[in-house]
From Swiss-Prot:
Gene Ontology cellular component list: small ribosomal subunit
GO MF entry, a single one: structural constituent of ribosome
GO BP field: translation
Protein name, per record: Small ribosomal subunit protein uS7
Ribonucleoprotein keyword on record: yes
Matching InterPro entries: Ribosomal_uS7, Ribosomal_uS7_bac/org-type, Ribosomal_uS7_CS, Ribosomal_uS7_dom, Ribosomal_uS7_dom_sf
Complex formation: Part of the 30S ribosomal subunit. Contacts proteins S9 and S11.
Function: One of the primary rRNA binding proteins, it binds directly to 16S rRNA where it nucleates assembly of the head domain of the 30S subunit. Is located at the subunit interface close to the decoding center, probably blocks exit of the E-site tRNA.
The keyword GTP-binding appears for this protein: no
Family listed: Belongs to the universal ribosomal protein uS7 family.
Gene for this chain: rpsG
PANTHER family: RIBOSOMAL PROTEIN S7
Classification via SUPFAM superfamilies: Ribosomal protein S7 (SSF47973)
Length: 156
């Protein structure tokens, strides 16, 4: 913890093409070894594939997919009297977005298509239709929280 007050959170700049901070966060998460240009190309190419396959606006599909992936609840381990309980907690908006992007990329990287842009496009299209591995991860997280609802009174 800092001794001198609160540290200001750095804000990301909106991306040049769609003017969206969420897309910038997606690009930053795709990026490996500081190669932002490559990450941008992957992201924008995936958006083009989405527009081509779905016939809808890529940004619209992306937003729908993100809403279908972002979790509302999660469980957090809490140790009480020698026993560890999985306590369900609400997810803050910032963390919801981060988890959504993280789960989407993990699911996309595990897919079978040839290039990352095809995998990302496929996962986003699946997520916008409420299918796919990232949506399953969200459902599993919600089921876990629902199953442990009895321990909600141990909340932080």
């Amino acid at each position: 913890m800092p001794r001198k007050g609160h540290i200001a959170k750095r804000d990301v700049l909106p991306d040049p093409l769609y003017n969206s901070k969420v897309v910038t966060k997606l690009i930053n998460s795709i990026m490996l070894d500081g190669k932002k240009g490559v990450a941008q190309k992957i992201c924008y190419d995936a958006f083009e594939i989405i527009a081509e396959k779905s016939g809808k606006d890529a940004m619209e599909v992306f937003e729908t997919a993100m809403n279908n992936i972002m979790p509302l609840l999660e469980v957090k381990a809490r140790r009480i009297g020698g026993a560890t309980y999985q306590v369900p907690i609400e997810v803050r908006p910032e963390r919801r977005q981060t988890l959504g992007i993280r789960w989407m990329l993990i699911a996309a990287r595990k897919r079978g298509e040839r290039s990352m842009r095809e995998r990302l496009a496929g996962e986003l299209l699946d997520a916008s239709n409420n299918t796919g591995a990232a949506v399953k991860k969200r459902e599993d997280t919600h089921k876990m929280a629902e199953a442990n609802k009895a321990f909600a009174h141990y909340r932080y």
